[in-house]
Regions:
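Extracellular/periplasmic ectodomains of large secreted or surface enzymes and adhesion receptors
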Residues: 96-140
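Histidine- and aromatic-rich segments of cupredoxin/plastocyanin-like copper-binding domains
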Residues: 1-114
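Beta-strand cores of secreted/periplasmic/IMS beta-sandwich domains, seen most often
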Residues: 1-19, 53-76, 119-138, 152-182
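Eukaryotic Cys/His-coordinated zinc-binding finger proteins
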Residues: 142, 146-147
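Active-site-adjacent structural elements in folded domains
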Residues: 39-43, 148-155
Length: 183
């Protein structure tokens, strides 16, 4: 299991796992910012991460011969802080993995078919849910939400445990690509 985290302030990445000939190798995608997915996504070839996003992947290294070299590469171009550009191969190598079997015992672990149950709201709950609008803007080099700068000591919203709301996130700030993380 590899946890990939984009800890940068403005860069997007699109990661691929490739061998030394730049042939893409599949993996299983099991988690993102919201923790475990309901079920694993099998045979994935890429994971895109925005600012402060994470993705957990599982690679079955038993498929590879001892001393095989694999690389995590970024193929997403980005030349400005406003957002990503095109996907271009072969990409930039970010991490090298050399397959080793130490200790030399068989790994019998398996990714389960169900990772976690997620209770989905009913149509009636969605229809009755209150709507909050969050407008993101950027001025004088700072981001604001609903015309307010962030206050880390105050929650902007409080929702009853088990409650549901619809949040409308609007970023009319002229081409800035920026993921939103709700904590």
């Amino acid at each position: 299991r590899l946890r990939l985290l984009n800890a940068g302030p403005s860069r997007f990445y699109e990661f691929y796992l490739v061998n030394s000939a730049n042939v893409v190798q599949p993996f299983t995608y099991i988690a993102n910012d919201g923790n475990l997915l309901p079920a694993p996504l099998l045979n994935q070839t890429r994971v895109r991460l925005g600012v402060a996003e994470r993705g957990d992947i599982v690679v079955d290294f038993s498929r590879f011969a001892l001393n095989t070299e694999l690389y995590l590469v970024n193929r997403l171009t980005q030349t400005s802080t406003r957002g990503p550009g095109a996907v271009q191969a072969p990409g930039t190598r970010v991490m090298k993995i050399v397959v080793n079997r130490n200790p030399p015992v068989a790994d019998v672990s398996r990714v389960p078919t169900a990772l976690r149950a997620i209770r989905r709201p009913t149509a009636a709950e969605i229809a009755a849910a209150p709507v909050r609008r969050w407008v993101f803007s950027r001025r004088n080099g700072f981001w604001s939400i609903n015309d307010k700068l962030i206050n880390v000591n105050s929650a902007a919203a409080r929702i009853e445990l088990g409650g549901a709301e619809i949040w409308d996130l609007d970023n009319p700030s002229g081409g800035w690509a920026h993921p939103v993380h709700i904590h």
